[in-house]
Curated annotation (Swiss-Prot):
It comes from Acidovorax sp. (strain JS42). GO terms for molecular function: adenyl-nucleotide exchange factor activity; protein homodimerization activity; protein-folding chaperone binding; unfolded protein binding. Disulfide bonds: none annotated. This is Protein GrpE. InterPro entries: GrpE (IPR000740), GrpE_coiled_coil (IPR013805), GrpE_head (IPR009012). The gene is grpE.
Amino acid sequence: MSENQNPPPSPEEIEAAMSANAADELNRLQGELAELKAKSADLADQFLRAKAEAENARRRAEDEVAKARKFGIESFAESLLPVCDSLDAALAIENATAEQLREGSDATLRQLMSALERNKVVIVNPEAGTKFDPHQHQAISMVPADQEANTVVSVLQKGYLIFDRVLRPALVTVAAPK
């Protein structure tokens, strides 16, 4: 035997070494577990905060929409108040002449048209000969006419658009095919 050879470890030494390794491994795993638990708790907290923030944002958005619906017409209503004032003033006159009534009605109509225009309401009043547009016109009847077929002959009632969306189509008569 050479001097460099160590005697084989005894079973007790092997068991002690394994116990020491197991204890070290257990300590390492317990430390890792504690670290992961802390990270998990932190992530759970972050999740709950994010969830609460999302819920608050949703609630704020719902409140904003409710307020917009409730007060969205406020500007439009304010623009109609001068029209109401003019009508009240006209009704207060007891002995108005037909000419005064006509002038007052014209002025009130101009106020109303101005209020509609300020609120982006546009009149649809096609001229005779305009091509019939089913998106903006509603044909009430077709009549024989000396113009191209499917064109407007006359307007029975004006239509209105708001931001290119039809509020009411113009009621028109349309030239029948020849």
